[in-house]
Amino acid sequence: MKDKIIKKATDMFLKLGFKSVTMDDIACEMCISKKTIYKYFSNKERLIEEGTEVVHQKIHALMDEVISQNHNAIAENFQMREMFKEMFQSFDQSPAYQLKKHYPEIYQKMMENEIEDCSQMFRQNIEKGITQGLYRQETD
């Protein structure tokens, strides 16, 4: 039930905005009581935190999928950049803006995680490219 609540709430947050979706809205949409939601989440902020973690995991899984295709480093880099471009073109900026404005701590944590993962992935890509002889050794 907890995973179902996270999935539905996250879908609603991304579609309608973090601030505008209430616990009542989520309960009504799922045909459950608010008490059921509060059984798993102490407050809306906790639900948002877990929802953003699920989104982070999905993005990480997409990155892992690209890496697992064993392209050379340059092709992998281009495919990864194309994936991010598509992801952010279809990404509605309103929920991200609301998250930043109304839940800045959650937004900051989410951005730190994404930046760290992307930086690590690009560092690994550079190392792979150097090993494959596609990138120069002295690349910073």
Predicted ranges, named:
Residues 4, 8, 12-46, 50:
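Helix-turn-helix
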Residues 43-46, 72, 140:
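Residue-level recognition of oxygen-bearing side chains
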Residues 50, 54, 61-91:
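Hydrophobic alpha-helical connector segments
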